Amino acid sequence: MLNKPKEVQVTPTNSTADTVEQMVYPVDKHRKSELLAYLIGSRNWQQVLVFTKTKQGSDELVKELKKDGIKAASINGDKSQGARLRALEEFKTGKVRALIATDVAARGLDIEQLECVINYELPFKAEDYVHRIGRTGRAGHTGKAISLMSMDEEYLLKAIETLLDTRLPQEWLQGYEPDPNAPLKEDRPRQSRGRSSDKRKMKAKLKIHANRGKNKR
């Protein structure tokens, strides 16, 4: 028997905080960096944690953001511990506006009152989505979790929605609507159905969104 039992609550891997506002923006893959820069600038976000799938992708995104005048730094497995700590400190003190990270490198990150997390690329593991956005909306503060989804990532979104047992809201931003004729490049192994099937589905979704979706700047 326990003399002084205590109840410890652990957040399950299939739930997200109510304080986090989630949104998915469909966009062509090659326009993701452009949309990311637009969102950071137009929404005036001063502290944004951005997740990519690969180390190389995180470094390339830093270069793209700098071209748009947004100070950014990356933390990934190729960086030394000293370099990671410097990047994190610059992010916390406001010298760097966007911190680009991989899932592995971001483990253990603790940033108080982080205002926004962006999934530049959706994770292969749905549980990683929960871990990513769990870094905002802490201690009663509100936060935003934005996902930039290209057509070839729809299956990843479905996996996330299945895990969370909910549909995530989607919104098309005017000027960044996906092109239904864009070439499809999947990150997963090829399946039996062809690209024409995917394009037909995409065109059908375009018609649906045209009728009911919201277009905003």
Question: At which residue positions do the language-model features occur?
Answer:
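Conserved helicase RecA-like core
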Residues: 1-181
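Basic Arg/Gly/Lys-rich low-complexity intrinsically disordered segments
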Residues: 93, 167-217
